[in-house]
Amino acid sequence: MDKKLSYTFECCLKELEKRKAESPGDIYDSMYNQISFIRDCVERGLSIDEELAGRSLNFHLLSGRNLAGPGDKELIESISTITEFLMEYSG
């Protein structure tokens, strides 16, 4: 994993961890768990598709529905970068 992507994962997960503490519930937990899963697969050299075993990722949909405020810009950008990585990875 390159340094930029690693930093993106780190920033995204750190912000989601903060939001989980501030607003407990399923949304931030789900986003955190999915992005952490992707990062772990990439770090270990595992196939994300194989590890998903037919399940799907929806963190990008959750972010689109729940992140719209001015304070969400950096998190949205991080999630967009991770989504772009996944599109290239799968393509």
Model-predicted segments: where are they?
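Short terminal alpha-helical segments
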Residues: M1-M31, T83-S90
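Charged catalytic carboxylate motif
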Residues: T8, Q34, S78
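Amphipathic alpha-helical interaction modules
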Residues: E15-L62
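Amphipathic alpha-helical binding modules
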Residues: G54-G91
